[in-house]
Amino acid sequence: MPLKLDDYKLSDWTDDSINPVYLGYVTIEGHWYIKKIDNSSRTMRYAAGLSEYTTNWGLKDKIDYFYIHEVL
């Protein structure tokens, strides 16, 4: 069953004047994904998990990011 991205709500974001920009989304169940927008390379990549959003948000600049179809 595909994920319903409408279930994810924007929770955190970084300053959009700094590259890259990170956007953190969470469901009420605690599932999450972080979108990394790199304006220099004009790319968007994603990291996702089922728990530990706060920890991963804190490590957002150190975790691995992938194409959306690889993580969601």
Task: Label every PLM stretch briefly.
Residues 1-72:
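Viral virion structural and adsorption modules
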